Amino acid sequence: MAITPNGFIAKKDDSSDFLTKKESQSYVATVLKAGALVIGRRTYGVLSKQSEFQKFLKAKIKIAIVSKHSMNIKSPYHKVANSPQSALNFLKGSKEIVVAGGGLLNASFMSENLVDEIYIDIEPNLFSEGIKLFEGGSFDVKLKLLGTRMLSKNEIQLHYKVLK
């Protein structure tokens, strides 16, 4: 998941215009490799307007949208789930599942101890207000660094294992 050095995954208005093309390519490759994605309602709304979304539709990526509200979904491979566990039940059988926000959803997965690994792509931008990587929730998690990878001369990916 892309974040700024000060911990934001999106601007206050849900904009992610600070993300680089390299980051977008990394995100798409990760989701296509995994084959399954969990996102929140607002993230689904933003993602469905981006060109990357067409690649997910074409590849028949299973997407669980965690929301308490009913919504118009774009594919029979997408489903609204009312909880993190319900989302995982829908995606059962997937070899990997990417959880990609927003901050409330990320925090709920961490609070319910449902995360095994975290990939954080640090983007070279700072802004003072926005959506944090984790919004709310109650957790205290230790991590072990598994590796780092340069995405570009200004972007680095950190790969952590969640210690349970």
Language model segments and positions:
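Enzymes that bind and transform nitrogen-containing heteroaromatic metabolites
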Residues: 1-164
